[in-house]
Amino acid sequence: MLDPRARTLLKTLIERYIADGQPVGSRTLSRYSGLELSPATIRNVMSDLEELGLVSSPHTSAGRVPTPRGYRLFVDTMLTVETPIDAAAVARQVQSTLQAGEPQQKVVAAAASVLSNLSQFAGVVLTPRRSHVFKQIEFMRLSEKRILLIIVTPEGDVQNRMLATPRDYSPSQLTEASNYINAHFAGLSFDEVRRRLRDEIDQLRGDMTALMHAAVTASTEVPDTEDTVLISGERNLLEVADLSSDMARLRKLFDVFDQKTGLLQLLDVSSHAQGVQIFIGGESTLVPIEEMSVVTAPYEVNGKIVGTLGVIGPTRMAYNRVIPIVDITARLLSLTLSQQ
């Protein structure tokens, strides 16, 4: 537990390091902390903070820099998100980018782009998982014995399947089959539809039953779409010296983007929590680079969490600026998708 004096000095040190990117010495702390302390007293406090693992001393400087543990204490207990940016302006920019009525994938990709543009780092979005449940289906005759099955999920996602049938069906027969399925089975999983069709087979004409079974089989034969991670603005991170000045670190950074497995795991963890979360490199095992942090928030469709979005940037980022960008974008993406 830090005393108020140590907390003030640590907070000042981290704020100055975020602003300037240079190790912070006792003279700078004296100037910006608002505390009337001698340089010797400040150095003693810094030594205590170093022993606690909250700051460290680069070999080339007399000043100190925050450690991952110091950043964690800062964002958890000292950070005041006073939104130095214009929150209303951010909301307007996000809203102008996220257009209701656009295909879901396009809206989600736009969210990654707006996160990158506003933060000047990389924006990332875990796209919604495809639903095992359908809201509506439709059959469309393409040619003799070839039918297009159109599936609409509760999230508004549209999936298409091609059906090859042993016989031809008229448009009226296809309408009859889709109306029956929509009236009796909408909101159920296709496994449940298959089970119920088996129970109701005596009530249906044989040719309709065959078509419905073909539709259910086609819907479940295709493997579930893998969770997709969309990234925008990776090149922005080339301008961040903390991440790009070392070639090995830069290679590791782009391995993160190429592999996406670690990002997928991190975003999945975030989707099980409410509100904004901050993952700090060197402190979180989910972030493989000590100089990198990820700020995330889940987003919803009709009150149900379906994915996560966030900003990838340096550990030395202005958290009080990035957090509201992520929070506002998540809220407005949720609103846009729920209006689909």
UniProtKB/Swiss-Prot annotation:
The keyword Nucleotide-binding does not apply. It comes from the Bacteria. InterPro entries: GAF-like_dom_sf, HrcA, HrcA_C, WH-like_DNA-bd_sf, WH_DNA-bd_sf, WHTH_HrcA_DNA-bd, WHTH_transcript_rep_HrcA_IDD. GO terms for molecular function: DNA binding. SUPFAM superfamilies: GAF domain-like, Winged helix' DNA-binding domain. Pfam families: HrcA, HrcA_DNA-bdg. Keywords: Repressor, Stress response, Transcription, Transcription regulation. GO terms for biological process: negative regulation of DNA-templated transcription. PANTHER family: HEAT-INDUCIBLE TRANSCRIPTION REPRESSOR HRCA. Negative regulator of class I heat shock genes (grpE-dnaK-dnaJ and groELS operons). Prevents heat-shock induction of these operons. NCBIfam families: hrcA. Belongs to the HrcA family. This is Heat-inducible transcription repressor HrcA. The gene is hrcA.
